[in-house]
Design a protein with these regions (language model features):
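Structural/interface elements that position substrates and couple domains in central-metabolism enzymes
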Residues: 1-204
Length: 204
């Protein structure tokens, strides 16, 4: 596979995908209004998805919280509006179930796949390079399965809404875990007890 792929969004996730896919000789075009500022590369002009006639699109744009706590999908919708022909699309951006349902209803003519990301911002490239698995669901499974296996990843296939809810609960669990051990640390400090020894007793 040597397809031309557009990556929309050049934050940590977009950069990690660009790095890995270019290593496997895919032709990558980034669409991001701040791309030049982030890389100092001369891109000629600030194009949109349809300008590059890609074989596939990976969406890594931000989905910030609205004031009511819901997931704002406007950036994802903006990218999808620029996909003018039915090519495989993979969304890596964080979505809610409601957001996913709205997107798939609005763009029912597109093959849209969802794939959650669990990369740490400060180590995104290394995390993605050395991860062994990638989960995905919906859309053109056959295309993405072939692509990621070509990049030496084990592909786990689930329903998109299972993946969305799984990521949400995983993040909640990790936050609870951090809060739990913060309380353990405070208790150890108050009692003048070695926190690291207690932590090992809890986790081993």
């Amino acid at each position: 596979m040597k397809d031309k792929i557009v990556i929309a969004g050049y934050g940590a996730v977009g950069q990690a995908h660009e790095y890995l896919l270019e290593r496997f000789s895919f032709k990558i075009q980034v669409v991001d209004p701040n791309y030049y500022k982030k890389t100092w590369r001369d891109v000629g002009f600030n194009g949109k998805v349809f300008d590059y006639n890609p074989q596939a699109v990976i969406i890594c744009v931000s989905t910030p919280q609205n004031t009511d706590g819901s997931c704002n999908i406007d950036n994802v919708v903006d990218v999808l509006n620029d996909v003018l022909k039915p090519v495989p699309v993979m969304i890596k951006s964080t979505l809610s179930i409601e957001g996913w349902r709205k997107i798939t209803a609005m763009f029912s003519h597109l093959d849209i796949t969802y794939s959650p990301e669990y990369l740490r911002q400060e180590n995104a490239i290394q995390d993605f390079e050395f991860s062994k698995e990638i989960s995905l669901g919906g859309g053109d499974i056959a295309y993405w399965d072939k692509l990621w296996k070509y990049c030496c990843k084990k592909v786990i296939i689930r329903e998109p809404e299972e993946l969305i809810l799984g990521k949400s609960f995983r993040n909640a669990f990790l936050a609870t875990k951090v809060n739990f051990f913060n309380q353990v640390y405070d208790m150890c400090k108050a009692c003048n007890i070695d926190f690291e020894q207690v932590r090992q007793e809890v986790t081993n």
